[in-house]
Amino acid sequence: MKYSGYHLVIDLFGCNFDQLENTEYIIEMLKKLARALDTKIVAKAFHKFHPQGFSGALIISESHITIHTWPEDAYIGIDIFTCSKCFDSRKIVAYLKENLIFKKVEIKEILRGKID
């Protein structure tokens, strides 16, 4: 069976407030994640909300990586969607553990666009 894409949905709970408010750090961490996944960034957009929170999107040649933070809820949502390859979610979680402070992670792996 063939699919058009692979979608990894990552929810991080119990995140560090100060780290989530450090948008420069989050942006660099996201770019490093894209490089670690061996993807090519073709566009990017970032927005800082007030009084807090941040959203960012990297358009990669394979699709996209997005992040949304809710410091007031100690939560981060990350989506990685690609049309070219599946990623090892364990390696991605290991990368996130090295670069972010959080207490709990939930992951959903979704195969998208089934082709008969």
Swiss-Prot record:
The keyword S-adenosyl-L-methionine belongs to this UniProt entry's keyword annotation: yes
Site entry: Cleavage (non-hydrolytic): 62-63
Pathway(s) where this gene product acts: Amine and polyamine biosynthesis; S-adenosylmethioninamine biosynthesis; S-adenosylmethioninamine from S-adenosyl-L-methionine: step 1/1
Catalytic residues, chain numbering: 63 (schiff-base intermediate with substrate), 68 (proton acceptor), 83 (proton donor)
Single Gene Ontology BP annotation: spermidine biosynthetic process
Modified residues annotated as Pyruvic acid (Ser) in this record: 63
Entry-linked Pfam families: AdoMet_dc
GO molecular function terms listed in the Swiss-Prot or TrEMBL record: adenosylmethionine decarboxylase activity
Top-tier EC class: lyase
UniProt GO cellular component terms: cytosol
Entry cofactors: pyruvate
Chain coiled-coil ranges: none
InterPro entries in the cross-refs: AdoMetDC_fam_prok, S-AdoMet_deCO2ase_core, S-AdoMet_deCOase_pro-enz
Record bears the keyword Metal-binding: no
Keywords of the record: Autocatalytic cleavage, Decarboxylase, Lyase, Polyamine biosynthesis, Pyruvate, S-adenosyl-L-methionine, Schiff base, Spermidine biosynthesis, Zymogen
Gene3D superfamilies referenced in this protein's UniProt entry, alphabetically: S-adenosylmethionine decarboxylase
EC number: 4.1.1.50
Entry-linked SUPFAM superfamilies: S-adenosylmethionine decarboxylase (SSF56276)
PTM description: Is synthesized initially as an inactive proenzyme. Formation of the active enzyme involves a self-maturation process in which the active site pyruvoyl group is generated from an internal serine residue via an autocatalytic post-translational modification. Two non-identical subunits are generated from the proenzyme in this reaction, and the pyruvate is formed at the N-terminus of the alpha chain, which is derived from the carboxyl end of the proenzyme.
Note on how the cofactor is bound: Binds 1 pyruvoyl group covalently per subunit.
Catalytic activity line of the entry: S-adenosyl-L-methionine + H(+) = S-adenosyl 3-(methylsulfanyl)propylamine + CO2
Reported function: Catalyzes the decarboxylation of S-adenosylmethionine to S-adenosylmethioninamine (dcAdoMet), the propylamine donor required for the synthesis of the polyamines spermine and spermidine from the diamine putrescine.
Family to which the UniProt record says this protein belongs: Belongs to the prokaryotic AdoMetDC family. Type 1 subfamily.
Subunit: Heterotetramer of two alpha and two beta chains arranged as a dimer of alpha/beta heterodimers.
The protein's name: S-adenosylmethionine decarboxylase proenzyme
